Amino acid sequence: MKEYLSWGRYPRQSQQAVEMYWRHSKLPLEDFGDRTCLPYGNGRSYGDSCLNSDGVLIDTRPLDRYIDFNPESGVLRCEAGVLLSDILRLVVPNGWFLPVTPGTRFVTVGGAIANDVHGKNHHRAGTFGCHVHR
């Protein structure tokens, strides 16, 4: 058991967690019984939406690798645990910027997608999910 927090640092909950190291790994679902599974990024949600009190957290922070970046088109493929701050370090020197940025750069890509975050330009650019392609 490990303690996980949301950004508000309340509630503090000890949770069973499984760290994901490879995006193609299969989760040991048979070990979880009837408990629910919830992916966990960097814990920057204001509420407790990133906590799973009676379930299992799937810690995606180790999934922090880039898959591909095309500096011509600006298209980036990466894993769920990559922080927006790391993306900015990669894309800004190439003349790109994220179309939507929430109030903190310490959000993971997976968290930004799961919560469909928005920035101050929401009325023009929409949410993070508007710029995600499969």
Regions found by a protein language model. Give the residues of each.
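FAD-binding subdomain of flavoenzyme oxidoreductases
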Residues: 112-134
